[in-house]
UniProtKB/Swiss-Prot annotation:
It is found in: Virion; Host membrane. The chain crosses the membrane at residues 423-445. GO terms for cellular component: host cell membrane; membrane; virion component. It comes from Enterococcus phage phiEF24C. Residues 1-20 form a propeptide. Keywords: Host membrane, Membrane, Transmembrane, Transmembrane helix, Virion. This is Putative major capsid protein. The keyword Transmembrane helix applies.
Length: 464
């Protein structure tokens, strides 16, 4: 039998080019699109896939009443108390009671200024686009301004400034600062329960309010629903063999009335450090942080916080930009009653003056850094800001705001409703800004309550 042998043919360079020629391939650049690939049309789907939040994710901004303002300072009166009640109102037969006046005070709210600026070259609008670039930029600016207003309505702080004068910061005060300090409940990392909601409703009721709404991250609402699954069962069956199980809790009947529950997908987003955010050229230099464990009796750390590295990062914020996060400062806590002292040194070399520092602590479950405090630059002594962490704010927890959402209790003053302003054109591009001027007014601080450090379903996929 003749044995067949496999022989390898050596091809010339010309033959190799002929064999390889006229295959379309996957190249998408002129250098890689040769021969048949040079004839291939590019395909771009005409649908843009949204991978971030949209207007529908905003709840508080959509629900709250907006009132016009006609000055940069809005004034309003608050009725704090009636006249005296009780024994002194009883009199003898021919007597009259002593004079007793009601207690009224005047409050003020300073308007603050929110804007977002966009720029687009003229050529961008002339080419064949799948969507109108100007419409995309305008919609994005409106969404950014609305989201900023909603975030500040919860967490804004007008004292975050290098100026020690009260209210000199750029932000307006939010609910976390305006709510009466006696109306703050600490869940200490536990789940939201019916008892906590009832306790909050009692606080609101003692302020002569009626709680109507509760705003919380969706992770808190989902955890609240999970607690009901073993106590309440709902099975919905169609005409066949299919069944749907589970339910959603949209409201709660408290001791003071019905409370609508709103689960937000974006409420806590700005409280989490985005370490991949691009730094602007005018951003402040990053801070230097030193963490020290100190003896004390005010610490409120939990068992799970002990014997592990507790890690901190700090971001320096100016009017226009944020610094890169500082290097990690860590300490091992060995006693729940102790406290952590952070010494934050602000770099003397900066292009923009720092206004405050944001302090973050690492969560145990996700590994993300959660904001635990913001300290104004006015608190610095010789360039060093000192902060004491006693676990007053726990990472990977959230806030629940419960209160009376009526125009007589809380609303937004609007000096300038949201508008689009064309800016000066100095080159072949179009620049515009979307503006909003106003502030949050909480006329009755005791008619709202805050439940802090509430457990929620934390996720690691927060940022794209």
């Amino acid at each position: 039998m003749t044995e067949k042998k496999n022989t390898e043919r050596q091809l010339t360079s010309v033959q190799e080019e002929v064999i390889k020629g006229f295959t379309t391939g996957y190249g998408i650049t002129p250098e890689s699109q040769t021969d048949a690939a040079a004839l291939r049309r590019e395909f771009l789907d005409d649908q843009i896939t949204m991978l971030t939040w949209a207007d529908g994710d905003l709840s508080f901004y959509r629900d709250i009443t907006k009132r016009p303002a006609t000055s940069t300072v809005a004034k309003y009166d608050v009725y704090l108390a009636h006249g005296r009640v009780g024994h002194t109102r009883f009199t003898r037969e021919i007597g009259v009671a002593p004079i007793s006046d009601p207690n009224l005070r005047q409050k003020t709210v300073n308007m603050k200024y929110v804007s977002d600026t966009k720029n687009m070259s003229i050529a961008t609008g002339l080419v064949n686009n799948i969507e109108d670039p100007m419409r995309i930029l305008t919609d994005d600016a409106i969404s950014v301004v609305a989201k900023t207003i909603e975030w500040a309505s919860f967490y804004g702080d007008s004292d975050l400034s290098e100026n020690p004068d009260a209210g000199s910061g750029l932000e307006f005060d939010g609910l976390a600062k305006l709510i009466d300090k006696h109306n703050v409940l600490d869940a200490k990392g536990a789940s939201l329960t019916e008892a906590l909601l009832n306790q909050a409703s009692v606080l609101v009721g003692k302020g002569y309010g009626t709680p109507t709404d509760a705003y919380m991250p969706i992770g808190v609402q989902a955890d609240f629903v999970n607690q009901q699954l073993d106590r309440q069962v709902q099975v919905i069956s169609d005409n066949g063999q299919n069944a749907t199980m589970g339910f959603n809790v949209k409201g709660f009947n408290s001791a003071r009335g019905f409370i609508r529950l709103h689960g937000s997908t974006v409420m806590e987003l700005e409280q989490i450090l985005d370490e991949n955010r691009m730094q602007l050229p005018n951003a402040p230099q990053k801070a230097t942080v030193k963490a020290t464990l100190e003896a004390g009796t005010k610490g409120k750390f939990r068992d799970e916080d002990l014997t592990i590295d507790t890690e901190y990062k700090v971001v320096v914020v100016s009017d226009d930009a944020e610094s890169a996060p500082s290097d990690v400062a860590s300490v091992v806590i060995d006693d729940k009653k102790k406290q952590v002292k952070l010494e934050i040194t602000i770099n003397n070399m900066y292009q923009a003056r720092p206004q405050y520092v944001a302090i973050y602590r690492k969560g145990l479950e996700t590994g993300l850094f959660y904001q635990i405090a913001r300290v104004p630059a006015s608190k610095a002594v010789e360039g060093v800001i000192t902060f004491i962490d006693v676990n007053d704010e726990i990472p990977e927890t959230a806030d629940v705001f419960v209160g009376e959402l009526t125009p007589s209790v809380v609303h937004l003053f609007e000096l300038l409703p949201m508008m689009r302003l064309p800016l000066a054109q100095v080159n072949a591009s179009v620049t515009f800004a979307v503006l909003w001027y106003g502030a949050l007014a909480l006329r009755a601080p005791k008619k709202w309550a805050r439940i802090k450090n509430v457990k929620y379903i934390a996720t690691g996929n927060v940022f794209n």
